[in-house]
UniProtKB/Swiss-Prot annotation:
Gene3D superfamilies: P-loop containing nucleotide triphosphate hydrolases. One of its GO terms (cellular component) is cytoplasm. Residues 1-26 are annotated as: Disordered. Homodimer. UreD, UreF and UreG form a complex that acts as a GTP-hydrolysis-dependent molecular chaperone, activating the urease apoprotein by helping to assemble the nickel containing metallocenter of UreC. The UreE protein probably delivers the nickel. Belongs to the SIMIBI class G3E GTPase family. UreG subfamily. This is Urease accessory protein UreG. Transmembrane segments: none annotated.
Length: 226
C-alpha cells in the first residue's frame, strides 16, 4: 500500500471531538513514544501474538521514510496489504494530534481493503514526552519509554507518561548497563500516573510482551462487548 503524506500546511492545534466507535468498527490503539523506545518492536510482538486469533492491521508514521512499515514487512508480522504508512514531514506529532487527515485516510483505505478488521495498531513517529494521539484518531493509547534514558524519565512526566491509557517501560534488561534503578522507575510511574496502569517489560526476555498483550486483549474484549 503506497504511503500517505501529510501536506505542508501550517501546524495549528485543532481540537477534534472524541471518536465514538460504532459497533463493528475496528478498535484503534495508538502506540507512541520517543525515538528508539521500542515502539515498532512492540507492535511486531503484538502482531505475532494476535494475527492467528483476530483480523488486524498496522498503520505506521515516519517523518520522511516508510522505515517502520518496511521493518514490519521484512519480518512478515502481517501480510503486506495489512501494513500501511504515513509520511509525516517535519513534525511527527502533528499527524497524530493536530492534523490527523492523512492517518484517517490511511485507516479508511485499510478498512476498505479488509472489512473484517477487529484491530488497527497506529504507531506514531518517534517524538518526545509531549506527543499524544488525538482522541479523534485512536480509542486508547499506549506510550512507550525505555530505561536507556535513565530512571528519571517517569518522574519527568509529560502527557504521554502521565495520561496514556497504558505506560510501557521497555528494555528493562538494559537497566544494569545504564545504571537505571527499576524500582525508582516503578515508584515514579505510580506517583505520576495514579490509578492508570503501567508495565515494565523486556522484549528480549519476554518476546510476547505478555503484560501488554493481556491489556490489549482486555481492551478488545471491552470494545466487542459494546
Amino acid at each position: 500500500m503506497p504511503p500517505h503524506f501529510l501536506d505542508g500546511q501550517p501546524h495549528g492545534h485543532t481540537d477534534r471531538p472524541r471518536r465514538v466507535r460504532q459497533p463493528g468498527e475496528p478498535l484503534r490503539i495508538g502506540v507512541g513514544g520517543p525515538v528508539g523506545s521500542g515502539k515498532t518492536a512492540l507492535v511486531a510482538a503484538l502482531c505475532r501474538q494476535l494475527r492467528d486469533e483476530l483480523s488486524l492491521a498496522v498503520l505506521t508514521n515516519d517523518i520522511y521514510t516508510t522505515e517502520d512499515a518496511d521493518f514490519l514487512r521484512r519480518h512478515a508480522v502481517l501480510p503486506d496489504d495489512r501494513i500501511a504508512a504515513v509520511q509525516t514531514g517535519g513534525c511527527p506529532h502533528t499527524a497524530i494530534r493536530d492534523d490527523i487527515t492523512a492517518n484517517l485516510d490511511a485507516i479508511d483505505d485499510l478498512i476498505a481493503g479488509h472489512d473484517d478488521l477487529d484491530l488497527i495498531l497506529v504507531e506514531s513517529g518517534g517524538d518526545n514526552l509531549t506527543a499524544t494521539f488525538s482522541s479523534g484518531l485512536v480509542d486508547v493509547q499506549i506510550f512507550v519509554i525505555d530505561v536507556a534514558g535513565g530512571d528519571k524519565v517517569p518522574r519527568k512526566g509529560g502527557p504521554g507518561v502521565t495520561f496514556s491509557d497504558l505506560l510501557v517501560v521497555n528494555k528493562t534488561d538494559l537497566a544494569p548497563l545504564v545504571g537505571a534503578d527499576l524500582e525508582v522507575m516503578r515508584r515514579d510511574a505510580a506517583a505520576v500516573r495514579g490509578d492508570r496502569p503501567f508495565e515494565l517489560i523486556s522484549l528480549a526476555v519476554d518476546p510476547a510482551a505478555t503484560p501488554v498483550l493481556s491489556w490489549v486483549r482486555e481492551q478488545l474484549r471491552v470494545a466487542q462487548a459494546v
